[in-house]
Structures are given as structure tokens and as C-alpha cells.
């Protein structure tokens, strides 16, 4: 008896459906993408209990005639491509022709559709991949698809679904991504019979962000764009002080398709390096338009992954666009003190809470910015950087310190500065750290070093001598000149000029340990990390008393820094507070 045999069509369809339909959110994604490809201007998504028992997607797209409606449930039946050549010029979201067939194979589907100017529409009832009913019906132009009892015939798949609230969260994520990629379409999202949001469809990405994420995110947006042959980049990002513990607020789109791509993530990380802490992530809404021939979306049925033919070009374009937005924006956070609006019995007036957790960061909108940019136009609603031009970064990034008065220092750590109706508090250590970091980075080929009076002997762990030998050039660029001294020791002849001998020896050991314990794919990135550490060790510390001349020198150096807002590790250098806020706290005004 033969051991190998062909599977029947029903079983094949169920197996294939497993790649396309992972959960209710997958169904919503496929149906909405079909609606978008149909030219819809209004799309409604409704779910009950996470979409497990019920999903409905309604659109006003082109609709289908009876023949096309039936063909749509056949595997690999599509209107998007006709030959393998078309795979290299894909402009639609769907193209495999598997969506409806896969959905119908594991659920109960009711489809109603009608083309424009047709008297009647078509209604199909499909269960487990079989068409049970085909009738004429009266309906509006467009298509509506109801999906019931997901995985009703594959109980093994159904039991692996999460609880309804979790599945609903996945659906919400999918609808959110689709809204952001299609600002010209009005989306209505209804969950458990409650409207969650409605987008206007007016074509504004900013408006979609406002409706989905609220004023806090919208008010913190910065924007820049880049355009070259066969490539356009638009980047909306939150200012550095509004950041998150994961990448969930990062949305990447290539030719209108939501994608995940390591090159894009790396470009964002590099652009925000030293602007946010290493374990925090900014919100980013990134849109790329590129010739379809230079990308490959036919990697996986989910179509979430994309490959670029020239990763380096994409990386540099995205990095440059976001970095431009950061350079041309006011990134000073404003401190806001929340008030306790609950008055205890017999107590008059409001109590102001001064505990640390009540400090929150808010966008600075006052015109009296301490760093005033010359020859840069700003808009009231959003900080927009100009398109990339041939002028140098230094010309576009000129900052000057004007009309300020140094009030004094607080706790021998913070410098207080007054300008107009705003006062600023500067962390002297973070400010000096930023200044030293940028100075050292500018000396990229060789950090300035000095000869030591007496040789410094450094004892290393077994095996570290091989690492030191391999990375001699990197250590030299960091300011170290050394010789081997016995089996597991080296003698330092020159050390970075900004460090004292004890710190220089300690840092050398730390660098070797990090080279041993981590696989650094980018030596440039590693060098920048070590320079940041070097700057931190050499900078003035908290409780170091500065003279008035030293404070002014700190400001003179800070005002010409490329990024005067954060230290190399992403901590804020400067925060602000307004006179109005202070007067409200003292009840001088309401």
C-alpha cells in the first residue's frame, strides 16, 4: 500500500488558510486591504468579542458582478496580477488571490456586493469553503463581508486563540495601521457595538494621528521629508521627550503598505541616538514611496516583511530625514505641575502636589525659546524642517543664546536661567557631557591623547590579550597607545587627554570587557558608546561648584552644540517652566 498520497482539496485549503488566517485580526487585515484596493472612500469595521464569533467589513468600493464574486472564493483568483512579471511592479495591497478562499475555508461567510449602475447585487453564503447559497439582493454599491465562527471546523486552531479582549487588541492594531496608511479614506471602527474612532478621510496624516492617539502625541510631532530619484521619504516623529518602552508606536509604510524592516528600525535608532535613552523608543510614522522594482514584498503570505535592493541608500535617506527634523526643532521640554483638584472637607483652595512622580513632560510652545534658530521658518501647528537642500548642516543649524540672565545655581548641580517669561533649569553635568561628547566625536580619526608621566600597567584576564591585539586600531582611535607587558598585561604609554590616569586605566579595562562580552557589528557605534562614557567620566559632576565665568563658558559651548537638548545617553540637558505656571501655583492668577 502506498504511504504517500495526494491530499484532498478541502484539506489543502485548510492548511493554506493557516498561513493567511492566523487569528481574527488577519481576517480584518485581508478584508480591509481588499476594500482599499477596490477604491473605497468609506470603510466600516465591526467586531464582536474580539472578532471570534463575528466580523463585518463594509465598503463603498467598485463592487463585483456575480461571476467575479464566485471566482473570488477560488484560490489564486485575483484581479491584481496576471503573470510573474507583475510581481515586480506590485502597487496593490493584495495580489495572491488567497484571502477570501482562506477565510471561507475556516469560517462561515456571507458576502454582498454590487457594481455601480447595476440594478441588483449578488449575495453568497459560504461555509467551510463551499458555496451553499447564491442569490440576487438589493444593496448599496460596494461590498460587505460578514465572517462568523472563525475556526469553527478546525478546533485545534480555535483553542489557541487568546481571550476576546486580547484578540480585540490585535484587531485594533491592524485597523490603526491601515488608517495611518490611508488618510484619504474615512474609517469607522466599531467594537462590541461601540464606536472606537472615526477618521475624516481628508488626506491629512496629522489629522489621523490626532484622532487615533490624541493631543499629547499630535502636539509633540516634528516633520521632515526627503525626495530623490525613485525615492520619497516623509517622517513624522514625536519629540525626544515623548518616548516609549517598546516599538509599538513606530509605524513604517512602503508604498502604502505597513511593513516591518530591520533597516528602517536601525535608521530610526541611529537618528535618535543620544536624543533618547538607549532603552526608550520614539514614536515614528514613516512613509516611503519607492519604485516597486527596487523592493520585494513577496516574502511571506502576511506581506509584513519587505526587502530593499539597496539597504544602504534606504538607511541613509531615512536617517537623514529624521535627523533633519530633530536638528530644526525646539526640543526643550516644559515641566508641568499637576494640581490636586480634590479639596478635603474644610480646606480652602487647591493643593499643589510637589512629589516627583507628578512631574510630566509637555511640548514647549512659548516663543521665548532659549535656543533661537536663525533663518529657519516654523509653523504654529507642527515643527516642520525644510526639504533637504545643498546648504551645510552648520548653516541650517545655527543657534544663538540671546536676552538671557543667569539667576544662579541650585544644589550646586542645576543652573537657573531667565529669559522673558520663561525660566530654564540646566543640568550642568549633562550639558558638559554633551559638549565633550560632540568635541570628541568631531575628532573621529583620533581622540586627542597625552603621554603619561609614569607607565600604567594594566593586568588583563586570560584571553583578553588576543582581543587587545585584534582591536589595537580601535583603541588607538580612542586615545590609547600601549605595549604588551608579559603574558596578560599591557603598559599604557598614552591615554585620552580629557581623563586622569585612574579613570583612563579603568575605562581601558571596561572597553576590553565590553569587546569580550558583546559582538559589536558596528565599530563606529561602539566607538561612539565609548566616547559617551569617556565624556561622562570627564564632565563636571553634580555638586561641583562652578564660577560665573565657567557657567558662561558652558553656555557658550552649549549654544553651538548640534544637540543641546540631551546628554549622549538621552537624558535631558534643559527643562523649562513659565511665569504663568509659577503664578498659578502661588494663586496670583487663576
Swiss-Prot record:
SMART domains: DNA_mis_repair, MutL_C
Record flagged with keyword DNA repair: yes
InterPro entries linked to this entry: DNA_mismatch_repair_CS, DNA_mismatch_repair_MutL, DNA_mismatch_S5_2-like, HATPase_C_sf, MutL/Mlh/PMS, MutL/Mlh/Pms-like, MutL_C, MutL_C_dimsub
The keyword DNA repair belongs to this UniProt entry's keyword annotation: yes
Signal peptide: none
GO biological process: one example: mismatch repair
Any single GO CC term annotated in Swiss-Prot or TrEMBL for this entry: mismatch repair complex
Keyword annotations of the record: DNA damage, DNA repair
One Pfam family, short name: HATPase_c_3
GO MF terms held by the record: ATP binding; ATP hydrolysis activity; ATP-dependent DNA damage sensor activity; mismatched DNA binding
Function: This protein is involved in the repair of mismatches in DNA. It is required for dam-dependent methyl-directed DNA mismatch repair. May act as a 'molecular matchmaker', a protein that promotes the formation of a stable complex between two or more DNA-binding proteins in an ATP-dependent manner without itself being part of a final effector complex.
NCBIfam families: mutl (TIGR00585)
Family statement drawn from the similarity comment of this UniProt entry: Belongs to the DNA mismatch repair MutL/HexB family.
Name of the featured protein: DNA mismatch repair protein MutL
Organism (species): Caldanaerobacter subterraneus subsp. tengcongensis (strain DSM 15242 / JCM 11007 / NBRC 100824 / MB4)
Gene name of this polypeptide: mutL
Amino acid at each position: 500500500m502506498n504511504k504517500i498520497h495526494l491530499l484532498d482539496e478541502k484539506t489543502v485549503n485548510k492548511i493554506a488558510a493557516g498561513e493567511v488566517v492566523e487569528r481574527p485580526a488577519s481576517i480584518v487585515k485581508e478584508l480591509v486591504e481588499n476594500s482599499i484596493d477596490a477604491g473605497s472612500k468609506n470603510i466600516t469595521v465591526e467586531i464582536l468579542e474580539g472578532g471570534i464569533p463575528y466580523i463585518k467589513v463594509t465598503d463603498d468600493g467598485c463592487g463585483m458582478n456575480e461571476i467575479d464574486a464566485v471566482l473570488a472564493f477560488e484560490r489564486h483568483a485575483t484581479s491584481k496580477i496576471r503573470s510573474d512579471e507583475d510581481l515586480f511592479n506590485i502597487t496593490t495591497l493584495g495580489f495572491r488571490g488567497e484571502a477570501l478562499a482562506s477565510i471561507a475555508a475556516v469560517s462561515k461567510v456571507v458576502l454582498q456586493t454590487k457594481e455601480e449602475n447595476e440594478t441588483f447585487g449578488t449575495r453568497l453564503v459560504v461555509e467551510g469553503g463551499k458555496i451553499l447559497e447564491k442569490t440576487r439582493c438589493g444593496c448599496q454599491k460596494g461590498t460587505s463581508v460578514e465572517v462568523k465562527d472563525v475556526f469553527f471546523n478546525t478546533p485545534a486552531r480555535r483553542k489557541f486563540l487568546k481571550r476576546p479582549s486580547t484578540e480585540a487588541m490585535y484587531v485594533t492594531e491592524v485597523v490603526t495601521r491601515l488608517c495611518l496608511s490611508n488618510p484619504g479614506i474615512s474609517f469607522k471602527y466599531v467594537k462590541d457595538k461601540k464606536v472606537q474612532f472615526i477618521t475624516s478621510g481628508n488626506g491629512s496624516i496629522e489629522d489621523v494621528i490626532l484622532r487615533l492617539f490624541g493631543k499629547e502625541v499630535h502636539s509633540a510631532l516634528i516633520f521632515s521629508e526627503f525626495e530623490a530619484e525613485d525615492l520619497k521619504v516623509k517622517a513624522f516623529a514625536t519629540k525626544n521627550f515623548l518616548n516609549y518602552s517598546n516599538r509599538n508606536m513606530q509605524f513604517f509604510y512602503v508604498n502604502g503598505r505597513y511593513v516591518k524592516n530591520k533597516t528602517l528600525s536601525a535608521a530610526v535608532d541611529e537618528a535618535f541616538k543620544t536624543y533618547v535613552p538607549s532603552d526608550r523608543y520614539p514614536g515614528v510614522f514613516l512613509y516611503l514611496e519607492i519604485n516597486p522594482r527596487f523592493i520585494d514584498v513577496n516574502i511571506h503570505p502576511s506581506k509584513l516583511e519587505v526587502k530593499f535592493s539597496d539597504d544602504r541608500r534606504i538607511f541613509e535617506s531615512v536617517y537623514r530625514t529624521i535627523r533633519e527634523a530633530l536638528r530644526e526643532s525646539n526640543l526643550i521640554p516644559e515641566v508641568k505641575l499637576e494640581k490636586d483638584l480634590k479639596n478635603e472637607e474644610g480646606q480652602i483652595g487647591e493643593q499643589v502636589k510637589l512629589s516627583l512622580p507628578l512631574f510630566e513632560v509637555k511640548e514647549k510652545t512659548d516663543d521665548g525659546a532659549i535656543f533661537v534658530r536663525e533663518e529657519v521658518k516654523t509653523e504654529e501647528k507642527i515643527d516642520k524642517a525644510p526639504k533637504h537642500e545643498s546648504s551645510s548642516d552648520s548653516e541650517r543649524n545655527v543657534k544663538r543664546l540671546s536676552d538671557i540672565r543667569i539667576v544662579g545655581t541650585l544644589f550646586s548641580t542645576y543652573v537657573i536661567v531667565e529669559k522673558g517669561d520663561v525660566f530654564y533649569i540646566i543640568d550642568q553635568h549633562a550639558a558638559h557631557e554633551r559638549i565633550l561628547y560632540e568635541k570628541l566625536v568631531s575628532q573621529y580619526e583620533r581622540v586627542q591623547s597625552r603621554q603619561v608621566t609614569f607607565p600604567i600597567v594594566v593586568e588583563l584576564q586570560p584571553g583578553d590579550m588576543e582581543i587587545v591585539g585584534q582591536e589595537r586600531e580601535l583603541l588607538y582611535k580612542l586615545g590609547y597607545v600601549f605595549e604588551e607587558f608579559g603574558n596578560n598585561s599591557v603598559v599604557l604609554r598614552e591615554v585620552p587627554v580629557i581623563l586622569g590616569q585612574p579613570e583612563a586605566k579603568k575605562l581601558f579595562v571596561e572597553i576590553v570587557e565590553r569587546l569580550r562580552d558583546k559582538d559589536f557589528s558596528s565599530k563606529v557605534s561602539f566607538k561612539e558608546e565609548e566616547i559617551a562614557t569617556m565624556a561622562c567620566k570627564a564632565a563636571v559632576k553634580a555638586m561641583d561648584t562652578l564660577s560665573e565665568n565657567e557657567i558662561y563658558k558652558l553656555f557658550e559651548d552649549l549654544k553651538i552644540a548640534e544637540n543641546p537638548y540631551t546628554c549622549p545617553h538621552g537624558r535631558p540637558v534643559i527643562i523649562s517652566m513659565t511665569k504663568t505656571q509659577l503664578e498659578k501655583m502661588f494663586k496670583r492668577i487663576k
